[in-house]
A protein has these predicted regions:
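Acidic/His metal-coordination segments adjacent to aromatic residues that form catalytic metal sites
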Residues: 26, 101-114, 146-155
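Short, contiguous alpha-helical
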Residues: 1-13, 17-19, 53-99, 139-178
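Short, contiguous, helix-prone interaction/anchoring segments in small proteins
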Residues: 22-58
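Acidic/histidine-rich alpha-helical segments that form the ligand environment
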Residues: 32-39, 44, 102-139
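Amphipathic, soluble alpha-helical interaction motifs
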Residues: 40, 44-47, 51, 81, ...
Length: 178
């Protein structure tokens, strides 16, 4: 497999592109991505066989199950980061080791039902929360100490909408086709 093929498997929707300014209509579209994501993911996996959850989306990549558990972990973190940023002045968030978490017993279990339920609940609450934001609320920022950058909630929203699409394609790529 050459580097271009590997890059396509790693980033099936392309790498994340930072957006400095986000319009109200773009923000509405990004929130719609978050709102629709749990149902889209459920539809992708509803016809998975047990073996499909054990497949990786690329060589040395996570299994479909690990990706789904990662999504639950990551999106819980993001939702809480939004809440901290809304209620605190430029909080420093707590990063976590995604790779290590994916190897824990709950992150590598092939039964993904609990993580799908987490995503459904978190995304419902997250979107309900975002729907009440003003334009200025999205300008609030948090600091990511591992990356050493400040994220506005606009940027974080764009990142997590991309994250949904990115990993949805990974999960699709794990399905065994006859």
């Amino acid at each position: 497999m050459d580097q271009n093929e590997l890059e396509q498997l790693r980033f099936p929707v392309g790498r994340f592109q930072w957006i400095e300014e986000i319009s109200a209509s773009q923000r509405t579209e990004l929130i719609a991505v978050l709102r629709q994501f749990p149902e889209q993911l459920k539809k992708v996996v509803e016809n998975f066989e047990a073996a499909d959850f054990k497949n990786t989306y690329r060589p040395d990549g996570w299994t479909a199950a690990q990706v789904i558990h990662h999504l639950a972990d990551s999106h819980m973190h993001s939702y809480l980061r939004f809440k901290h940023t809304y209620t605190e002045d430029t909080p420093t968030i707590t990063p976590y080791d995604e790779g290590a978490w994916s190897c824990l017993s709950d992150g590598s279990d092939h039964d993904v039902q609990a993580s799908l339920k987490i995503l459904e609940g978190v995304h419902h609450r997250w979107c309900q929360f975002l729907d009440a934001f003003t334009t200025e609320d999205f300008d609030r920022k948090y600091y990511h100490p591992q990356l050493k950058i400040y994220f506005s909630l606009n940027q974080a929203l764009a990142l997590y909408a991309w994250h949904c699409k990115h990993h949805l394609e990974h999960v699709k790529n794990c399905k065994i086709t006859a």
